[in-house]
Amino acid sequence: MDVLTHAPASSSLCAAARSAKLGLSVAQYHTLAFQLPTPIASLISDCLYQYINTTNIMSSSSEAPPSNANEGCVGPQSEDAGKASACAGCPNQSACSSGKFSSPEAVAAQQAEADQIRAALSNVSHALLVLSGKGGVGKSTVACQMAWTLASRGYSVGVLDVDICGPSAARMLGATGQTVHASGTGWTPVYVSPNLAVMSVSFLLPDADAAVVWRGPRKNGMIKQFLTETVWDDDGLDYLIIDTPPGTSDEHISTVQYLQAVGGVSGAVVVTTPEEVSQADVRKELNFCVKTKVRVVGVVENMATFRTKVSSLGFRKPAAARSDSGGDGDGTVDCTEDVIKTLKEKCPEILDLMATADVFPSSGGGPRGMAQQFGVPYLGGLPLDPNLLKSCEDGKCFVETYSDSSAAGPLNALCDKLVKALPVEEEMDAEAINQQLMEE
């Protein structure tokens, strides 16, 4: 795809580039833009996204609404397109009423787009979304450690981070500071092991701390590039795990519409913590899946409890005087060394016991009850395990590095259910599998 050849003539920068006969692919062009000074990069990025969003229909069907359409869109080919009450305030209202989206050129463009996505994902067995209505519940932790666990079992796995403004997959998979290779065929993702690859916008940034301040159309264009221009393993992927931002934003809508255009969504794993504040937002996420017809593979309860060995706990006791608190200002002093020494002498078997505590209050039946309410499987709970957090910080596979840790068993059990729900070897009826998982 020669962006500079097809870019809008209104862009003087693109016009100059065309006159110089620079034939760069979208991937090469975007990678170049990130490396240039901000004013020039902005011009290049504007030019690129003018091209990418020239046709804003994300389906192989001409009936599909544009990605930025209002809820309740009647579709660009409807007789009421641009006139229905749902069209009020939609940025596409005038275009729909003029027939722009239903023109032969638009139909051909959207068909070409769908074909491109289909070709790029033709060797992917399952594309799995990891969703959460609430930020900070450990969605990226679950996504990346599921990827590590599946890869450790020999599956070929890819991780696509579509959290454009807050990417974290690169860090959690140990790929910080890496860059992607851009060629005429597209982007080659970063491989953190022979069968685990990751693609993220963080690989395109000149500085790890650089902010990505983009509006919806630019995010949509970036996601389109990820799906069409990333060259995954030639032998194919068993699982493409797509880590999304919290909520139901442009990234979710665009990703789902792009994938559904080619029948490429296998399902979604929804992550929550036990408290009602999180569940209230996750219920919205589950309703999003219902509206968009995305199968929910199951609900994961993260940070279900805090669980660790007694030997790894710290202990504090009230200070004789506040001035003795060692600078913590809480009126206590550390007594861990004395406690552990006493336990070793008096009752050493206690040190191997697991200490547990509920971190979040659970209400209304908790995540398990919420899953039952929506008729979807409950995949299990992951305890708040310090070693799991350390694995993410270090970019390591948790179940291999800390195989005896408290969350290793639950994480392996979660992946067992995931593989059963989305088998690679043989296709099974999704509804029957969901029913089996709910009964377990």
PLM feature spans:
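Residue-level signature of catalytic and energy-coupling elements of molecular machines
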Residues: 124, 135, 161, 169, ...
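C-terminal boundary of histidine-terminating zinc-finger modules
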Residues: 395-404
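A short, charged, Gly/Pro-tolerant segment at domain boundaries
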Residues: 428-440
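Walker A/P-loop phosphate-binding motif and the immediately C-terminal alpha-helix
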Residues: 120-121, 126-164, 286, 292
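Extreme N-terminal, non-catalytic leader segments
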Residues: 57-132, 426
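Phosphate-binding loop that captures ATP/GTP phosphates
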Residues: 156-158, 162-214, 220, 224-227, ...
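Conserved catalytic-core segment of NTP-binding enzymes
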Residues: 110, 239-376, 390
